[in-house]
From Swiss-Prot:
HAMAP family: HisF. GO terms for cellular component: cytoplasm. Its EC number is 4.3.2.10. GO terms for biological process: L-histidine biosynthetic process. InterPro entries: Aldolase_TIM, His_biosynth, HisF, IGPS_HisA/HisF, RibuloseP-bd_barrel. This is Imidazole glycerol phosphate synthase subunit HisF. It is found in: Cytoplasm. It comes from Methanosarcina acetivorans (strain ATCC 35395 / DSM 2834 / JCM 12185 / C2A). Belongs to the HisA/HisF family. IGPS catalyzes the conversion of PRFAR and glutamine to IGP, AICAR and glutamate. The HisF subunit catalyzes the cyclization activity that produces IGP and AICAR from PRFAR using the ammonia provided by the HisH subunit. The active site is at D11, D134.
Length: 273
């Protein structure tokens, strides 16, 4: 059985010189969590399997991803590094990979131009391309008969709508259908973030995580809502995810990566120690 991956996420803004890791609730009310390079070093030493580095304001502001911060981060870590935020061209991907990233995450640009996934996958390989999908629950079933309807924890039927620009713009696109299309176009992984759960510490959005894990053949990275090790366990055991991404519980030293992995190992979830 393949080991499950634990992936700290560094959400970075350019609000101060050199970049700053931030965390908020549903991508708003952001508070500083530290220097991205120092946090990356700590996670590398603590046993993280990979790192995800997201310039969360790049797409919204049309700004190029922070190449200098990527270079400094890549110099300090020796585990796979995925970089996302404002990536909308082949040249940008090339720059980021040259700066030291192992994979790139595409989100808004892929929704706007799905062929960008195929083009980038053809050039750099599917293993290099992660499609990030931000989604929100939508309980308007009556007016959306073509959507994939799932049953929420309380029995309410809902479909999941893709949102872009850091959650600021709804698209009307069904998240399950979009994930399948991204796989067909050549994406090597899906990074799934529930905007309803992001930063809430209420646990992963299990219905959509489980649905994508069951429907797709490529790995699903669960994201949004981790507040304790039990939530990560549920992401694997109930959500069937291949990897668990978390931010708050690691950034603010509530739990170490080693503690989380020990918790999972004791519950027979295969992890790399």
């Amino acid at each position: 059985m393949l080991t499950k991956r634990i992936i700290p996420c560094l959400d970075v803004t350019l609000d101060r010189a050199g970049g700053c890791v931030v965390k908020g609730v549903e991508f708003v009310d952001l508070k500083e969590a530290g220097d991205p390079v120092e946090l990356a070093k700590r996670y590398n030493e603590d046993g993280a399997d990979e790192l995800v580095f997201l310039d969360i304001t790049a797409s919204a502001h049309g700004r190029e991803t922070m190449i200098d911060v990527i270079e400094r981060t890549a110099d300090e870590v020796f585990i796979p590094l995925t970089v996302g935020g404002g990536i909308s061209s082949i040249d940008a991907i090339r720059q980021i990979l040259r700066a030291g990233a192992d994979k790139v995450s595409v989100n808004t640009s892929a929704v706007k131009n799905p062929d960008f996934i195929k083009e980038s996958s053809d050039i750099f390989g599917a293993q290099c391309i992660v499609t990030a999908i931000d989604c929100r629950r939508n309980t308007d079933i009556k007016n959306n008969p073509d959507k994939t309807v799932l049953e929420l924890e309380d029995g309410t039927p809902a479909w999941y709508e893709v949102v872009i620009y850091g959650g600021r713009e709804a698209t009307g696109i069904d998240a399950v259908q979009w994930a399948k299309k991204a796989e067909e176009l050549g994406s090597g992984e899906i990074l799934l973030t529930s905007m309803d759960r992001d930063g809430t510490c209420a646990g992963y959005d299990l219905p959509i995580t489980r649905k994508l894990s069951e429907e797709l053949d490529i790995p699903i990275i669960a994201s949004g809502g981790v507040g304790n090790p039990q939530h990560i366990y549920e992401g694997f055991s109930e959500g069937k995810a291949d990897a668990a991404l978390a931010a708050s519980i690691f950034h603010f030293s509530e739990y170490s990566i080693w503690e989380v992995k020990e918790y999972l190992r004791e519950r027979e979830i295969p992890v790399r120690l």
